[in-house]
Amino acid sequence: MACSTHLLSQSLYPLNRANPAAARGHLRFQASPSVRLGSGTSRRRALGLRVAASAEQGRRQVEVEYDLQAKFNKLADQIDQNAGITRLNLFSPCKINVFLRITGKRPDGFHDLASLFHVISLGDTIKFSLSPSKSKDRLSTNVAGVPVDESNLIIKALNLYRKKTGTDNFFWIHLDKKVPTGAGLGGGSSNAATALWAANQFSGCIASEKELQEWSGEIGSDIPFFFSQGAAYCTGRGEIVEDIRNPLPANLPMVLVKPPEACSTAEVYKRLRLEHTSQTDPLVLLKEITENGISQDACVNDLEPPAFEVLPSLKRLKKRIIAANRGDYDAVFMSGSGSTIVGIGSPDPPAFVYDDDDYKDTFVSEACFLTRNENEWYREPISSKITSEEDLPPEVASVSD
């Protein structure tokens, strides 16, 4: 099985490199120095030695030559082939639901859905390092309140990978969190998918992408989606993933506006009334969006009414964004179970988000649609940035013991 291609946004460090300067590439020496003994004018090569005789001076010259460039390049190539990686940095992007239909309730208590999921350019960065421990992973993060124990989906994903493959790698992980929690953006699910991808890289890609996708459904319904190529029609609980041929254009901008309050997914589903959901066939919505692009009518989210019951201020926020729209947004809708409101068509939020004190703690970010190639992980666009008033969540470190 071919190992996956690593992107520019990912850092790989081979083992057993004596020269730190060569840690990110091959050893290369530009000079080919030699050791010279004596002097002379005429020389001939024999077994790596240059021996020259001078009749006039009655002396012999011996010159020992080392082709250091070739020697060390060969050694570096051997190290690159045999060494594993010890550290890896990966981008962990979130997603939005361009439309979300709830089509029924299952006997197991879950709901069936049909949704167009799409990865976007807002995301976290996760740094993985091999740990000498053979019993425990160690997770740290820059945000207070994010669990760093085995309840975190990153740790669950690493435990799942070891269970499925029999590998025994444990890790130090640092999560640089930019995606807000309780936002309906799938940040935790993306982190879990990224951890599975990373564990597979450290193990020499012994599992296929299809296997990673299938395994991931055991710990979260949204996780399998991130093993698509970035745009997929998802059904079942979300774990049935079908890549779509025509992802939405990467140059179509959007703005994300999330109030500080979160929506409880469980509470939103508890208030859902199937008789009040849209009756539009989700395949009709999919065809409309993939063929004709984003429109307000096509961006249906059946979870909006119950989410607005849970958080009435979210309904007011959506209405104000629509009212302030001067043709900038093709559609304004809630992602997932909330509480993020998405405006497609412009990266700029309405002015009231900055001017009104009621929204002073609101998270705001511009974003664009994002995809990936098969056997490559997502890479962060250079232009991605956060634009909230505080820029990032509080920089409070917490580390598991």
UniProtKB/Swiss-Prot annotation:
Organelle transit peptide residues: 1-52
Compartment(s) where it occurs, according to its Swiss-Prot or TrEMBL record: Plastid, Chloroplast stroma
Record keywords: ATP-binding, Chloroplast, Isoprene biosynthesis, Kinase, Nucleotide-binding, Plastid, Transferase, Transit peptide
Enzyme class: transferase
GO biological process: isopentenyl diphosphate biosynthetic process, methylerythritol 4-phosphate pathway; terpenoid biosynthetic process
GO MF annotation list: 4-(cytidine 5'-diphospho)-2-C-methyl-D-erythritol kinase activity; ATP binding
SUPFAM superfamilies, A to Z: GHMP Kinase, C-terminal domain, Ribosomal protein S5 domain 2-like
Highest taxon, organism lineage: Eukaryota
Pfam families linked to this entry: GHMP_kinases_C, GHMP_kinases_N
EC number of the protein: 2.7.1.148
Binding site for ATP: P180, T181, G182, A183, G184, L185, G186, G187, G188, S189, S190
Keyword flag Metal-binding: no
Main localization, broad class: plastid
InterPro entries: GHMP_kinase_C_dom, GHMP_kinase_C_sf, GHMP_kinase_N_dom, IspE, Ribosomal_Su5_D2-typ_SF, Ribsml_uS5_D2-typ_fold_subgr
Catalyzed chemical reaction(s): 4-CDP-2-C-methyl-D-erythritol + ATP = 4-CDP-2-C-methyl-D-erythritol 2-phosphate + ADP + H(+)
UniProt pathway annotation: Isoprenoid biosynthesis; isopentenyl diphosphate biosynthesis via DXP pathway; isopentenyl diphosphate from 1-deoxy-D-xylulose 5-phosphate: step 3/6
A single GO cellular-component term on record: chloroplast stroma
Kinase recorded as keyword: yes
PANTHER family (UniProt xref): 4-DIPHOSPHOCYTIDYL-2-C-METHYL-D-ERYTHRITOL KINASE, CHLOROPLASTIC
Function in brief: Enzyme of the plastid non-mevalonate pathway for isoprenoid biosynthesis that catalyzes the phosphorylation of the position 2 hydroxy group of 4-diphosphocytidyl-2C-methyl-D-erythritol. Is essential for chloroplast development.
Family stated for the protein in its record: Belongs to the GHMP kinase family. IspE subfamily.
Protein name, as recorded: 4-diphosphocytidyl-2-C-methyl-D-erythritol kinase, chloroplastic
Source organism of this protein record: Oryza sativa subsp. japonica (Rice)
